[in-house]
């Protein structure tokens, strides 16, 4: 395929065979490939606009790669938790290491067993928890100390992908860095 895909993972981070994590747009390289795919498709539909479509895709790719490269680091990968596992396509760009999720479905509350697993296997004393804004503090306060970072992997309400990706990456990076002491 034209996209780099990763398998879905269980709550503890193990890959699930024969699955695909559908959050592919969060990988900067995938975002660029999607832009060129759209430009190529639209160029076939409207050949008179081909130069404009390709120029737009090229400009997008330059902006996206410039924004994403500012996070690259040779330091040890930084652990984080998520409410549900939606951010693995950000991990390479931000040098993150998934340390577990509370639930595999954002609409289902975490189990006591999963909270205990996270507590017993926490890689840092204080952890960053990436979660939907709808997540209730009662669902994660047992994990304290945590830095709760509300995020929306769908980028709902945004009208510029590069800006939206940068906001998501910046929030994520700040949260994870704040727990590295």
Task: Describe the residue ranges of each PLM region.
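Extracytoplasmic metal-acquisition and chelation regions
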Residues: 1-181
């Amino acid at each position: 395929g034209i996209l780099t895909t990763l398998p879905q993972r269980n709550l503890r981070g193990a890959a699930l065979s024969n699955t695909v994590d559908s959050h592919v747009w969060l990988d900067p390289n995938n975002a660029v490939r999607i832009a060129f795919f759209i430009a190529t498709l639209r160029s076939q539909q409207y050949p008179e606009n081909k130069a404009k479509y390709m120029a737009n895709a090229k400009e997008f790719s330059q902006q996206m790669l410039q924004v994403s490269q500012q996070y690259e680091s040779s330091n040890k990968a930084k652990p984080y938790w998520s409410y549900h596992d939606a951010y693995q396509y950000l991990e390479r760009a931000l040098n993150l290491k998934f340390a577990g999720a509370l639930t595999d479905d954002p609409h289902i509350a975490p189990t006591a067993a999963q909270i205990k697993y996270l507590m017993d296997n926490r890689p840092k004393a204080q952890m960053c928890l990436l979660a939907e804004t709808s997540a209730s503090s009662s669902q994660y306060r047992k994990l304290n100390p945590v830095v709760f970072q509300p995020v929306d992997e769908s980028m709902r309400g945004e009208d510029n992908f590069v800006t939206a990706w940068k906001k998501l990456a910046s929030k994520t990076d700040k949260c994870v860095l704040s727990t590295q002491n």
